[in-house]
Amino acid sequence: MIERGKFRSLTLINWNGFFARTFDLDELVTTLSGGNGAGKSTTMAAFVTALIPDLTLLHFRNTTEAGATSGSRDKGLHGKLKAGVCYSVLDVINSRHQRVVVGVRLQQVAGRDRKVDIKPFAIQGLPTSVQPTAMLTETLNDRQARVLSLQELKEKLEEIEGVQFKQFNSITDYHSLMFDLGIVARRLRSASDRSKYYRLIEASLYGGISSAITRSLRDYLLPENSGVRKAFQDMEAALRENRMTLEAIRVTQSDRDLFKHLISEATNYVAADYMRHANERRIHLDKALEYRRELFTSRKQLVAEQYKHVEMARELGEQNGAEGDLEADYQAASDHLNLVQTALRQQEKIERYESDLDELQIRLEEQNEVVAEATEMQEENEARAEAAELEVDELKNQLADYQQALDVQQTRAIQYTQALQALQRAKELCHLPDLTPESADEWLETFQAKQQEATDKLLSLDQKMSVAQTAHSQFEQAYQLVTAINGPLARSDAWEVARELLRDGVNQRHLAEQVQPLRMRLNELEQRLREQQEAERLLAEFCKRYGKRVDIDDLEALHQELEARIASLSDSVSNAGEQRMSLRQELEQLQSRTQKLLQRAPVWLAAQSSLNQLSEQCGEEFESSQDVTEYLQQLLEREREAIVERDEVGARKRAIDEEIERLSQPGGAEDSRLNALAERFGGVLLSEIYDDVSLDDAPYFSALYGPSRNAIVVPDLSLIADQLEGLEDCPEDLYLIEGDPQSFDDSVFSVDELEKAVVVKIADRQWRYSRFPTLPLFGRAARENRIESLHAERETLSERFATLSFDVQKTQRLHQSFSRFIGSHVAVAFEPDPEAEIRKLNTRRGELERAISLHENDNQQSRVQFEQAKEGVAALNRILPRLNLLADETLADRVDEIQERLDEAQEAARFVQQHGNQLAKLEPVLSVLQSDPEQFEQLKEDYAYSQQVQRDARQQAFALAEVVQRRAHFGYSDSAEMLSGNSDLNEKLRHRLEQAETERSRTRDALRSHAAQLSQYGQVLASLKSSFDTKKELLTDLQKELQDIGVRADSGAEERARIRRDELHSQLSNNRSRRNQLEKALTLCEAEMDNLTRRLRKLERDYHEMREQVVTAKAGWCAVMRLVKDSGVERRLHRRELAYLSGDELRSMSDKALGALRPAVADNEHLRDVLRMSEDPKRPERKIQFFVAVYQHLRERIRQDIIRTDDPVEAIEQMEIELGRLTEELTSREQTLAISSRSVANIIRKTIQREQNRIRMLNQGLQSVSFGQVNSVRLNVNVLEAHATLLDVLSEQHEQHQDLFNSNRLTFSEALAKLYQRLNPQIDMGQRTPQTIGEELLDYRNYLEMEVEVNRGSDGWLRAESGALSTGEAIGTGMSILVMVVQSWEDESRRLRGKDISPCRLLFLDEAARLDARSIATLFELCDRLGMQLIIAAPENISPEKGTTYKLVRKVFQNTEHVHVVGLRGFAPQPPESLPEAADAS
């Protein structure tokens, strides 16, 4: 008996509380006992992790978290580990007594999400002496050890001979090894299998009836429906060949379409990119060469521009310097012109003011005389007015006094007093103290005489004063003229200086008359000097441009030489233009021809590609279109011959098929109707009786029975006589032989055996001679031999038919290809190669471009020389007329000499202009200056004194006259005399007063009118004096300003200054124009230099980038080319017609192909990954790898039994040809196939009955299991009602639904699903397809429903639900069911693993305290009976009597936490044996 494998131990390394702990596992039950937090769950978690290292499934939770949501739970593994490397290892001894160590390396991953890294591994061949802890750790000293990393563990184990260490990258590989070695009961192929296994472990660990396991008990307990699948296979056995043919057609169809699609799109995708890279490489090379040419050209241009810039900058500097001088000269000339104009305006003002002053002087002298006369007359009028006033006042006083005397008595006294006052006043004024009224007349006469004398003297002095005043005015005028001309001087020197000035004025006038001739001479010389300077400048510029110093004498010869050069260069330039035009025309013609060839090249390449394909297909070379048409006629003849031969082979093949079908009839009947007749007559076919005849005897018996070989042997002929009447459905000749089919022999005939023949005596008069057939068909052996030979011949004919069909279709396709070629390409296919002509044209174009470039350079040089020569001739044309000026070396000295003379003359002219009028005025009054009228002041004093004397005398005479007038007042007589005398006096006084008042009025009027006239004369005099003084001051200022201007203001000065200014302005304008041209040219040159510099930098950068790109791409391109050549796909990828497409068109073509390829390879992971990698534009070789991968993939998919080629492109053609043949074969055999639904229903019923019986057997093992109130456990398996109806219909009423099963559009599964829907219209099928539903209906497990029932107390049999059972009962019930599941898995998987392996059985149970002692004992019995291991976690109050118990106590020592473990053997049957105590170091 095969021993069951066992788990020996569990080892935990670096877990929380366990540094290096090995738990030896009992063969039955291992109990982990300890309080809360002792480490029981951690130990079982380590065991489960080593069994199922799937982080998506592992979830260690407490039982108190049952109601928590999954999102709030911690997976629980991270917290059970310590930092660093951790291990969980299982030590197993399998049924072969092999030691296997399996486990996982765990390590916490830093981060907030508390992840754990798991690596499974396995160790085989490890000696039993090596303990897991010693293997996984390294001892450092007595109290320290180090955990080895996985790499260190591998290196350590490699040192041990015979030990194999395996590390797994997938959990599937890990579980596959565990299944093969008998560690797990079931092969866990997928995540779904792992999930089932984990759910089983989880249900075992936490106890109870898991709803998930209860719902999926069918998946856990019922094996795969191999019986139904076998029935389905048997049911379709008759369809196999047809299915294979159909599958071949479908595969061929899909492969053909896939091949076409993949080949075309992959070729477009890769070839477009390949040719784009080839074009880009060629373009990049051309660009790199072009960049290099442009770089060298730009460098030359930059050097030329720099030289040009230096020359223009130098010339611009000279022009700027010259411009500064010209601007200064022009500004000076402009200022000089302004000064001349200002001086002329000043001179005009001076002349105008001088004339005005002369007029004013005359008017002033005249006005002075008028004012003097008016003043004298005014004084006289004033004297008369004053006398009149005095007389009127006196008369009024007298008359008032007289009137007063008349009015009062004191009048006389008043008059007398007044008389005395008048007398006293006269004494005072006349200085006559002895004056009396009587002597007043005498003194009056004396003083009147004195008054007359003073008046006469005053008049004399006035006359003298007038004469002196005139002489003094003339002297002062002459002195002022001398002072104005010469400046301040002594009055005594005025006459001498005036004489010198007059003599010098004559000389100055003579010099001033020479100004105009000198100026004209100077202008002429200055013009010649300027022309000389201009000629020297032009000569200097010419020499600078010419590059060497040229003598004046050589200028004419040089002029002739330059004219000759111009003529020659002109001819050269004109000839160069014609030559350039001819070259350009030829280049344009080449370009036009090239464009036409470029347009024709793709068409020609397509035609050549088609022609090459035709040549490859037929193996012929075609030189002309006539060869093509001749070969096409040969193809037609060959096609007709092949069709005839194919039809003959097809007819023979069909005959063989019919013969094989006839020979394959049951019992050897050649006619299928014989079997029905034999069954109807109750007989047996003769061929069936002799079915066991050997192959050697077959010819004899075949000849013996002859035509009656197909007879029916019946027990009694008389019984079937009636049945023969009306018999129609039978062969033409039906032989019936009477005899016992069980003991039939050949005694019915009289036979004589001859050499290879027999003579059968049928009757006395009828014999039959039959030779032994060459191919006997009597007996199964003979028929099988014949069928075998027929099959061999049929295979040969099939191959020949396929070959001929292929050849026919190939010929037809070749004919179609020739027809398409003739219709599309024959017109251009045999024309010359346009690409060769394009290459020749490109070579010629390059030569032309180089010739044009060289010609342009030469022409440019000639143009430059031509322009230089023209400029030189133009410069010489301006210089040659001035050669005499260039030779005149004394011109500048003569200009200086004339300039000095002109300066002197201009100075004289300015003197004459300034003082000419003054000298003219001085000349007639020169004699006045000889004597100085110094007595004029004394005369003025005498005149004033005489005026005062005359005024005093007049007052004295008036006073005396008043006394004389009042002399009567000194003696009055009586009042009568006084009244009469006063009356006369009053009248006289009144008359006199009237006369005096009239005189006074007249004198007043005269005084007023004369005063007004005098005032007017004074105002006119003041105005004239003011105007004279103002204009004299202005004239002085103007003369000073004119002197300050310092410019000679003659008549031609302004014209000369303007001409000079205009000349300088013209020169300055020309200079500025040249400077602007130079600045613009310099700016353009700098811009051109900047552009050239930027362009040069850009070209250098582009050239280096392009060169680097070319060099970089060269390596990649070499790799691509090497890969292309090594893979042999260059012919497919190098599509020359694509070279004429643009990069965008090729990229678009590649992108479109890529878009079509993505869905095409979506189902192929390898091609999808390679395609995704090929999308990297930086790795073009990956596209080649993708193309090679597509070719390799297609080669692998070529069915060699159908298509005999390795080339996918050829395979496409063969597929299309083979498709027709397979379709015909399918059509011919489709009618002979049939399907039986009754057999399928019977097999499903039998499978259901077998599984129900197996479940009943399992229930017998569960009937003795009891937990608490649960007395027994069982499983109920029932068939669903809807599915039972389906089985009944399939077996009994299938004829009613043949429309489904006979449909060519439905598979059997789909027909089954349609039938199920037809029978159960009330059931909602959801989104599932009929194929899916039909496949489910072929699985017998879907016909069954399964539930768990318990016999509990007085309730009897109940459905096992967690609500109806206690916790302990649920745990026990669940454990029982899980044991059944494990046992069922082992039975199911026994055929998959080795026969000598019995897998390990192990389950878990956490919180076993919920089970009573009886339940636990039952679990022990269950483990013992089933050979199962069980790990139980229980609190300290549970102490099983059997198995091994570990006491776990978690302790803290020096801030270090570890679990103290004590192991005990079971103590019920024997004294307890204590295991050595072990404490873990942490």
Swiss-Prot record:
Superkingdom field: Bacteria
Keyword hit for NADP: no
Region (Flexible hinge): 666-783
Location (main, coarse): cytoplasm
Keyword NAD tagged: no
Cell compartment(s), UniProt: Cytoplasm, Nucleoid
Family annotation (InterPro entries): MukB, MukB/SMC, MukB_hinge, MukB_hinge_sf, MukB_N_dom, P-loop_NTPase
Protein's GO biological process: cell division; chromosome condensation; chromosome segregation; DNA replication
A cellular component term, taken from the record's GO annotations: cytoplasm
Keywords (A to Z) from UniProt: ATP-binding, Cell cycle, Cell division, Chromosome partition, Coiled coil, Cytoplasm, DNA condensation, DNA-binding, Nucleotide-binding
Coiled coil: 326-416, 509-603, 780-805, 835-923, 979-1116, 1210-1265
Classification via Pfam families: MukB, MukB_hinge, SbcC_Walker_B
Residues at which ATP binds: 34-41
GO molecular function, one term: DNA binding
Quaternary assembly: Homodimerization via its hinge domain. Binds to DNA via its C-terminal region. Interacts, and probably forms a ternary complex, with MukE and MukF via its C-terminal region. The complex formation is stimulated by calcium or magnesium. Interacts with tubulin-related protein FtsZ.
Function: Plays a central role in chromosome condensation, segregation and cell cycle progression. Functions as a homodimer, which is essential for chromosome partition. Involved in negative DNA supercoiling in vivo, and by this means organize and compact chromosomes. May achieve or facilitate chromosome segregation by condensation DNA from both sides of a centrally located replisome during cell division.
Recorded family membership: Belongs to the SMC family. MukB subfamily.
Domain notes: The hinge domain, which separates the large intramolecular coiled coil regions, allows the homodimerization, forming a V-shaped homodimer.
Alphabetical list of NCBIfam families matching this protein: PRK04863.1
Protein name: Chromosome partition protein MukB
